[in-house]
Amino acid sequence: MLKVAVVGASGYTGVELLRILHCHPEVAVTCITSEQSAGKPVSDLFPSLRGRYAQVLENLEPIRVAEKADIIFTALPHKAAMEVVPTFLKLGKRVIDLSADYRFNDAATYEQWYEPHMNPHLLPKAVYGLPEVRRAAVKGAKLVANPGCYPTSVILGLQPLLKHKLIETAGIISDSASGVSGAGRGAKVDNLYCEVNEGFKAYGVGGVHRHTPEMEQELSLLADERITITFTPHLAPMDRGILSTIYGRLLTPATTAELAGLYAEFYGGEPFVRVLPAGGVPSTAHVRGSNFCDIGVVVDQRTGRVIVVSAIDNLVKGASGQAVQNMNIMCGLPEGLGLEGLALVP
């Protein structure tokens, strides 16, 4: 039985980790921390966990946490993870970090978009934890940088096209809509019910969203050349989910059926990627609460563009579910263990 700690359990990714790990047959959650709510029962913070987690939330004391766990999930804000991850690694623990602190290959890029990096020497040692791209590297990793939610949806949507060199690498566009939980659990005026309900808006327009360089780094590695992407995120009036609509110009003519077949073959062995039949497009409703990424691909013959639509649950495949998927791979467990749940319908 794996002993697991969840560090920073007061947010949505933290509670989602607890929800998923409760159903994992090879895991015992032995430590749960929250600086804001230390001393309170977990169920006080999240009544949905009542009767399933009897623990009291603890202060974050890295040595004490490490004594209790084999695997540590850090669900902390950016920068906060950097303050504790080195200690966990020195103590021989394996870490899956859900912040952006270790997603970049170089400190300069991180610092351009976030802030000064406290331990840049760890960046080359971290594995970007998108299993469908880096499964072999994740298997032997000590530190996994769990991908962002938007990048997960976009990278999975584009991977077959880039690997097969089917589209121009210039001019790729993604319009992506996320549920409000993607903004976190903290109180913000923009996320109040009356501000979000019955509305749909773009934000981070003009290439300023922090997930942009993360996408570009990974897409460039897939294409083996420098890629820039026009990425515009949107806030949708729903709790959870991401729908990315991605546009690329085909280098050679192809039909919808041909590309749907290519995608189906490319992802045929993947447990959590479902390719829709030719002409089908996914919905966030069909992945809600699950670890699936649903993908549809359509060719616009008039313009010579291919349109890829991908749907994920931002809190599951876009965060905590993917983190558990990475844990399974790191520990030599069946990849889908604890993640077999289907979408919540309706």
From Swiss-Prot:
Q: What is its main location?
A: cytoplasm
Please tell me whether the keyword Cell membrane is annotated for this protein: no
UniProt pathway: Amino-acid biosynthesis; L-arginine biosynthesis; N(2)-acetyl-L-ornithine from L-glutamate: step 3/4
- Database matches in NCBIfam families: argC
GO CC field? cytoplasm
In its UniProt entry, the species of origin is given as Geobacter sulfurreducens (strain ATCC 51573 / DSM 12127 / PCA)
Give the family this protein belongs to, as stated in its UniProt record. Belongs to the NAGSA dehydrogenase family. Type 1 subfamily.
Q: Which GO terms describe its molecular function?
A: N-acetyl-gamma-glutamyl-phosphate reductase activity; NAD binding; NADP+ binding
Q: Which GO terms describe its biological process?
A: L-arginine biosynthetic process
| UniProt xrefs under SMART domains | Semialdhyde_dh
* Catalytic activity, reaction form: N-acetyl-L-glutamate 5-semialdehyde + phosphate + NADP(+) = N-acetyl-L-glutamyl 5-phosphate + NADPH + H(+)
Protein name according to UniProt:
N-acetyl-gamma-glutamyl-phosphate reductase
Q: Which lineage is the organism of this entry classified under, starting from the top rank? A: Bacteria, Pseudomonadati, Thermodesulfobacteriota, Desulfuromonadia, Geobacterales
